[in-house]
Amino acid sequence: MRISIAAIGKSGQSPEHDLVHRYFNRLPHKGALIERDSSKTSGLAGKRDEGKRLLAALPAQCKLVVLDENGVNLSSVKWAEQISSWRDAGIRDAVFAIGGADGHSEDVFAAADKTLAFGVQTWPHMLVRAMLAEQLYRAEMILARHPYHHA
């Protein structure tokens, strides 16, 4: 199963960008890092525009996991179990989506198969990308029974 990260906003050259790529490039079944520009329009119209562009960039019939502060909190082991169950079910693509500054549009939430959170705190978007890439790599290492998870 290919695993991709889709995000609103360009990462540019930054320490966070380097960290995202460090972990993402270690994934054995990586898909794509999909970035879409933030909308030039603010408010609800901007959020809808971002959502439309994000959804248009996704692979057909992918499992869409939306990151949102109101999502479910899962342990690293539970993330790994979820990824494993999708692989076992023959899912070809899973995409983890990070919204723009105003969050995800209703269309993105409606298309989501799962909504996850990184705790109750609010995190900078670029840091969330790095945290997500690391957790996806950690999930792969858990499934491979590699000592990384307990190192």
Task: Describe each region flagged by the PLM.
Residues 25-26, 86-89, 141:
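Arginine/glycine-rich "motif VI" loop of SF2 helicases in the C-terminal RecA-like domain
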Residues 1-27:
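N-terminal beta1-alpha1 ligand-phosphate binding loop
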Residues 5, 65, 99, 132:
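Conserved RecA-like P-loop NTPase ATPase core
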Residues 106-150:
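Structured adenosyl-cofactor binding patch, chiefly the S-adenosyl-L-methionine
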Residues 28, 61-62, 112-113:
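Short, well-ordered alpha-helix to beta-strand connector turns
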Residues 11, 69-72, 100-103:
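Short glycine-rich anion-binding loops that position phosphate/pyrophosphate groups of nucleotides
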Residues 17-18, 47-48, 76-80, 109, ...:
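Conserved strand-to-helix beginnings and helix N-cap segments that scaffold or border functional pockets
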Residues 31-95:
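S-adenosyl-L-methionine/SAH cofactor-binding core of RNA-modifying enzymes
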